[in-house]
């Protein structure tokens, strides 16, 4: 009788629920699926920053101007201005090759700002989230640094104009349009690429602080882009000296590019 009563009490007792272990949400490929917490949508890890910065730098350091000129049998570092950028390739190798160099250098900046951060986030199992603009700045700046100080050429690279334009195309497209308009206007008037590039950098450094050219809220993106414009101007120090002396070469529209044996200017 006592045993039967004990069994009845045990049966009437509410069943205790065992703890259910929730899956760990670590990225878009996690078991959480669409229930991924909002905080996991941003990448805060040092690994992500290192991967984005290093990959962008190595892409930016690819010396397309040097490689294109070498394919044409020219050492671009020994002719013209001895710069590996598109302008020297345009003058010393040919117009088409110079345009190709400009587009490829521009593509390096765009890849650093757009492709590399998104790919790094995907490979590491996350998304860029609300800080996408900051990661684009990181990748773009590292790409420009790679072009300016390429590890493949002993850290002696170009001036960063085309690569900066490509970076801005991914970060602040409206600012690119304004800077490009200023660059073209200055080039048509002066026929001097260096002067046009310097003026475009000045226009960018000023306009980037005001809508609709400002890429994001806060002071960091405009500050970084202003410093980048200052870097481009600083890389034109020799050109500024020649402009003041009146010896800076002008772009000759409609003329054939000089031979590789042309002495440096």
Which ranges hold each PLM region?
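Interfacial segments of multi-pass membrane proteins
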Residues: 90-95, 116-120, 142, 160-190, ...
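Loop-to-transmembrane alpha-helix initiation sites
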Residues: 177, 193-201, 216-228
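Helix-coil boundary and interhelical linker segments in multi-pass alpha-helical membrane proteins
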Residues: 41-51, 114-138, 169-176, 210-222
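Cytosolic, membrane-interface loops and tails of multi-pass inner-membrane proteins
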Residues: 66-98, 241-265
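Multi-pass membrane catalytic core of lipid/isoprenoid biosynthesis enzymes
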Residues: 91-117
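Short, non-helical or kinked segments that cap or interrupt transmembrane helices
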Residues: 75-86, 152-165, 192-200
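N-terminal signal-anchor transmembrane alpha helix
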Residues: 48-71
